[in-house]
Amino acid sequence: MVPKLIPVPLSSSSFIEFGSVLDRNLTKKISINQATTTRFHKMATVKAFPPDAEVILSIFSGINRGYPLEINMMERHPIGTQAFFPLSEEPWLVVVAPDSGDKPDEKRMQCFLAAGNQGVQY
């Protein structure tokens, strides 16, 4: 049975076991294009395995599934990092679990409440 998870606030220290927190408010901002655009500089470093593998960027748009949210699937991506960042300013949930061989360790699964300006990379 999967445990009932209580979200905790997302922070660099609370998420360190799983990856990095990306935060627009803590990232160097550079004004470009005659001050019409702000670049949030070097928020994440992309890693792929092997190192010469092609790296791509995709954008996914998910739907709000409501609460209580039942987690019935988790993914694992051992050959490269992924970053998740909201397209809106709305808070969102990040549910992660450490690897336990070939599947997630459900007993150590954690839920984080991310602010609309925060993303994660792992």
Predicted regions span which residues?
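Short acidic-glycine-tyrosine-enriched beta hairpin
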Residues: 103-121
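Non-catalytic, conserved peripheral segments adjacent to functional cores
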Residues: 1-107
